Amino acid sequence: MNMCGNIKNIYYFCTLKLSNRNKIMRNIAILGSTGSIGRQTLEVCAEHPDLFSVYAITANRSADLIIEQARQFHPEVVVIADETYYDKVSEALSDLPIKVWTGPESLCQVVTAEPIDMVVTAMVGFAGLRPTVAAIKAQKMLALANKETLVVAGQLIEGLCAEYQVTILPVDSEHSAIFQCLQGESIARGCFPWLANDNANPEKPHYLDNPIDKLIITASGGPFRTFTMEQMRDVTAAQALKHPNWDMGAKITIDSASMMNKGFEVIEARWLFGMNTDQIEVAVHPQSIVHSMVQFSDGAIKAQLGCPDMKVPIAYALSYPDRMPSQINGKLRIEDYAHLTFERPDLERFPNLRLAFDALAAGGDRTCVLNAANEVTNEAFRRGQCKFLQMAEVNEKTVAAMPFVASPSLEDYFEIDAEARIKAREILGL
């Protein structure tokens, strides 16, 4: 079924696709199937083989794991992006009727395959931008876990979603929470124009079209929430990788420790939900039970609560607009939580969050530059090449050193990203 047509038809498409379960199975392509989100997405698919067929899986260079996944799920296509590993994967799967692709264009090629209904962008970092754009232009539904796509090029992606009438479903727990809080509200903003009430009265006051006062994105605070600046000076990557609540990949776990991940989620929320920067707040919530909140113009607040298990937002995105039973590690018992606490983030101890707000407010290419610098400093910290607090210092210096580009094109973003990485490495002395 083609998603062409007016915007109102997109909601109908989503509803039809999952309500008629006895007749229609959703074909899924998972970009980054060997990462944390990719593996958990496959687990959700395995729990519901009557609803989801894994059509394609991709990895950069994790050859052994993608071979194992291919033998379990029997996809039509396997992509190993790094050509160095093509022979190994191809030979290992030669006894199965599976196409094995490789090379820099293979990701963009696979997302355009006609049988694919939904693309799950589970890969990490800037590398997710080009295949995400290709999937949008192919009018595929997107389950977006690659937040860097919107961090780098949110305005571009928002415009493409409107042009190609494509549905983006957030996989991040915080944005999934906000998305769930908006169900039933008359709102048509950001990447969700189809949330509007089709029967809305065109004569009603304009303010009723924007009932949102602000979004409140929660943050655990990470492993160093209570550390002083002095204590954080010498923390190690091993310490930073011990997140108190969530099981995530290495890059995002370090970003969570520095609160850059929360900064990126602020930027992502701005584009997903069409908010102004001053309509987005961050609240540190150490228990990670309230995943995010929406405050409306009448003062009411909606919140989505649940155990910190990424399979819940993954399953919600895959099955939207329905909900599926999920084999999560225990459902929330609210009586077990006598106290849920919230506090303001400390921008002096966690300057990366401030940098994200500043870059978003500045506009243009600033968020792209910040993301590029952060990918360099994050990796350098994991390799022991820079200190924990040095990451934010280098990120800020890189943004300040790069010339401002007000309206980047898609190709501009790739040039800006490359130049910002060079500058960040230069500042680090690498």
What is each model feature region?
Residues G5-N6, Y11-T15, S19-R21:
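Short, positively charged and aromatic/hydrophobic N-terminal segments
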Residues N22-L430:
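Catalytic, metal-anchored helix/loop core of enzyme active sites in primary metabolism
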Residues M1-M3:
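Methionine residue identity
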